[in-house]
Amino acid sequence: MWFKNLQVHRFSAPWSPSADEVEASLAKHAFFPGTSLEMQTQGWASPRDNGPLVHTVGRQMLLTLRTEKKLLPTTVVNQVTRARAAEIEEQQGYKPGRKQMKELKEQVTEELLPRAFSIRRDTRVWIDPDNGWLAIDAAAAAKADEVRGMLFKALDPLPLINLHVNQSPVAAMTEWLAGDAAPAGFTVDQEIELQSGAESKATVRYVRHPLDPEDLRRHIAAGKRCTRLAMTWNDRVSFVLTDGLVVKKVAPLDVIKEQADGTAHDEDERFDADFTMMAGELSGLLVDLTEALGGERKA
């Protein structure tokens, strides 16, 4: 249930539609399986099997954007197109021109699409309207951009902006390592990436490796800056902070898992309990992380 990544956003103005209102808006852009000739289809799906498009617990909302894509390798299309082109050349006595090759490739694609396999990818969105957070569970910026585009399309107007802080993650993370002191409530873990600002982009990575403060300071003195840092918040949640203010590798620690054990009687109750706990913990983490980065900067 827990999100593994957080692409963090803020509401720039109060946003408090009811779950029913959000449901009605998403329903206009709901997911439907694509036809045999569609390369990709996208729409909102239920976070739970056959449930509503907006899963709510209290004021917390959970959404799911589903993407279905046909797997049709370019190499296969090109191979069949070349074979067809050779047949045409033999028939007409000369090679097909550029326009004819383009039309032939489109024809081959249409013929192969119905036989192509489909894969589905779900990307989840957590909305905390009371505290003004919206987070997308996506590691890559491109996937987050897709979700944002669909959110703006379905929930217009949506006063959504990226989280802005007063101190850049790179400057803050480098400062913490140079001073061998994590911000209050956080500890530094054994995964670090230091990168040079020079054209070479020389990079040093520590993965599950004991950290030597003097060694880190030497790298920083040589001009390297921290672009990736593993941390733990209040002994409850571990994560990796990136230079782009993306929170990755989010994982609840044992103390949270122990609290969750035995509190639910069935799968639905367990899902809601996990979602409630995740929302509460991540909201607290984001507040403290924002403060550690100098506080929120209003755009």
Swiss-Prot record:
It comes from the Bacteria. May be involved in recombination. GO terms for cellular component: bacterial nucleoid; cytoplasm. Its main location: cytoplasm. Keywords: Cytoplasm, DNA recombination. The gene is rdgC. HAMAP family: RdgC. GO terms for biological process: DNA recombination; regulation of DNA recombination. This is Recombination-associated protein RdgC. It holds the Pfam family RdgC. Coiled coil: none annotated. It is found in: Cytoplasm, Nucleoid. GO terms for molecular function: double-stranded DNA binding. Belongs to the RdgC family.
